[in-house]
Swiss-Prot record:
Heterotrimer of A, B and C subunits. InterPro entries: Asp/Glu-ADT_sf_sub_c, GatC. It catalyses: L-glutamyl-tRNA(Gln) + L-glutamine + ATP + H2O = L-glutaminyl-tRNA(Gln) + L-glutamate + ADP + phosphate + H(+); L-aspartyl-tRNA(Asn) + L-glutamine + ATP + H2O = L-asparaginyl-tRNA(Asn) + L-glutamate + ADP + phosphate + 2 H(+). One of its GO terms (molecular function) is glutaminyl-tRNA synthase (glutamine-hydrolyzing) activity. HAMAP family: GatC. Keywords: ATP-binding, Ligase, Nucleotide-binding, Protein biosynthesis. It comes from Chlorobium phaeobacteroides (strain DSM 266 / SMG 266 / 2430). It comes from the Bacteria. The gene is gatC. The keyword RNA-binding does not apply. This is Aspartyl/glutamyl-tRNA(Asn/Gln) amidotransferase subunit C.
């Protein structure tokens, strides 16, 4: 498969890009080089190779969801340099 300047112009339009003549030529050559490189994958012998969707056997390995005791809000707020009611008070950062 090869890419023409018309293909690159169409892709550029979809991506809302504008290329000059030199850039259009460069992009056409580069995309053709990339596709040629990717096409080499068709030469790989995959006979007898099982398809896989991940290199890892396990998926979504999560720790057990165990309820633990934690410190109270009042204890947390004891470490706050400044507070208002039950909240940390911080300097305003948005004008």
């Amino acid at each position: 498969m090869s890419v023409t300047k018309k293909d690159v112009a169409y892709i550029a339009e979809l991506a809302r890009l504008k290329f000059g003549d030199t850039e259009m030529e460069t992009m056409t050559v580069e995309l053709n080089n990339i596709l040629h490189y990717i096409d080499k994958l068709n030469e790989v012998d995959t006979e007898g190779v099982q398809p896989l969707s991940s290199i890892h056997d396990e998926s979504n390995v999560l720790r057990a969801d165990i309820e633990k005791t934690s410190i109270s809000t009042d204890q947390v707020l004891l470490n706050a340099p400044d507070r208002q009611d039950r909240f940390f008070k911080v300097p305003k950062v948005i004008g």
